[in-house]
Amino acid sequence: MYPERFSHLPEYAFPRLRALLDGHKFSGPQYNMTIGEPQHLYPLWIKDVLLDHLDGFNRYPANDGIEKLQISIVDWFYKRFGVVLSSDKNILPVNGTREGLYNVSMALCPDKLSDSQPFVLIPNPFYQVYMISALSVNSEPLFISTDEQSGHLPDYFGLKADILNKTSAAYICSPSNPQGAVATVDYLTALIELAE
């Protein structure tokens, strides 16, 4: 039995697609299109490294992640972007993007904003978890088309003030998926200014 707030959630997209395809006969080669699942064997040396480091795999990791991993992530951000981060305040390893994106909505989206249901801005095409996380926190997903004219990034700048004032979150993906457009520093700066 699920809480009432989850009763209106749609079925995830990939099982819906599977149901549409089931029962159809196909000729020719078939390909496993499982999303995000590696399709190739890992290099053999990885097996040796894993076997050499099995100690500790019988316990759950710390809630905040493995400290050595967090420090490595902080170091990478500094080397790559010159950004100074704190491993205990800015880094939280998650089991995958779905978990992290969903939990961000759960943590940041209020029940009401300006006495009404908040919006969550979502670029379209979109990653299914954007919509599901918005619906899970009783927010209204507002899909913003991304096309050649917008540089394949969402144009949140043209939205009316009454929508922006009721917006609790806005998703941005750079590079955009599936188009691969990369947000510029100017775009991201303008987006932060819009949010403020």
Q: What residue ranges belong to the model's regions?
A:
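Conserved core of the PLP fold type I
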Residues: N58-E196
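Generic N-terminal amphipathic, Lys/Arg-enriched alpha-helix
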Residues: M1-S7
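N-terminal small-domain helix-loop-helix segment of the aminotransferase-like
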Residues: S7-E99, N103
